[in-house]
Design a protein with these regions (language model features):
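Short, loop-centered acidic/histidine patches that primarily coordinate divalent metals
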Residues: 142-143, 170
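Helix-terminus/linker motif at the lipid-water interface of multi-pass membrane proteins
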Residues: 3-33, 51, 89-98, 159
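Short alpha-helical transmembrane segments in multi-pass integral membrane proteins
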Residues: 49-114, 155-213
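Small-residue-rich hydrophobic transmembrane alpha-helices
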Residues: 23-87, 118-140, 151
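Residue-level hotspots within pore-lining transmembrane alpha-helices
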Residues: 1, 5, 13, 34-38, ...
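Hydrophobic alpha-helical transmembrane segments in multi-pass integral membrane proteins
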Residues: 149-155
């Protein structure tokens, strides 16, 4: 689903011309380094939450997820702001075109919100999966991707050009992140985590040999 919607946004970018396509590419290449923080936190959080849920330490899992989100926001936010500030020099690695460099810097400033949304999205999706709450992230994420990344990038691109397409990216990440945060905050994952615990305990008890008297 994501790849198809991204191809739609890429097609919308290509319609704007070679310069827009180059700017799009250079900005994404920069952001992939920023996104490593969210990706790493998401993987680590999924592993740690899975272990804590398996041990029945649900409150500790909740605290750990909140701490991971907070640290991710600080680290990703600082790095993307730094990238936007140094863009006039950094982008000269790719091109000397002043228009491309200025547009890329604009996109990087827009990406501050994008990366903050990505932190919520990746960290919380991993955490929800680890608790057994797998359907909501898939359904909510798919709806946001189609609506904002796919349809939104096409419509906003026609009206506002490349910054409009970037706003569609921002909306997609932020909406998905907000939905995952809402899901976690209202503790809708708890029934799934408790179900996993019951199944584990039942499995352990069934494999425990009876004590001979």
């Amino acid at each position: 689903m994501y790849r198809l919607a991204f191809l739609v946004s890429l097609s919308a970018t290509a319609r704007l011309g070679v310069s827009a396509l180059a700017t799009h590419s250079y900005t994404l290449q920069t952001l992939k380094y920023v996104a490593l923080i969210s990706i790493a936190l998401g993987w680590a959080c999924e592993i740690m939450v899975g272990r804590l849920v398996g041990a029945g330490r649900l409150r500790e899992a909740d605290r750990m997820v909140r701490k991971a989100v907070r640290n991710g926001l600080l680290a990703s936010g600082a790095l993307v702001i730094f990238a936007a500030l140094v863009a006039p020099w950094w982008m000269q690695i790719f091109t000397r075109d002043v228009v491309i460099i200025e547009t890329a810097q604009t996109l990087l400033w827009l990406s501050v919100m994008l990366e903050l949304g990505r932190v919520f999205n990746l960290v919380l999706v991993g955490a929800l999966r680890a608790t057994g709450d797998v359907h909501f992230p898939v359904l909510a994420g798919s709806a946001s991707i189609v609506l904002f990344l796919g349809v939104g990038s096409y419509l906003l691109g026609r009206s506002f050009g490349l910054p409009g397409i970037w706003m569609a990216y921002v909306l997609d990440e932020c909406v998905r992140g907000a939905l995952m945060w809402w899901r976690w905050r209202r503790q809708a994952w708890l029934p799934y985590a408790k179900l996993i615990l019951r199944r584990m305990r039942k499995s352990q008890s069934s494999h425990t040999p009876a004590t001979q008297t």
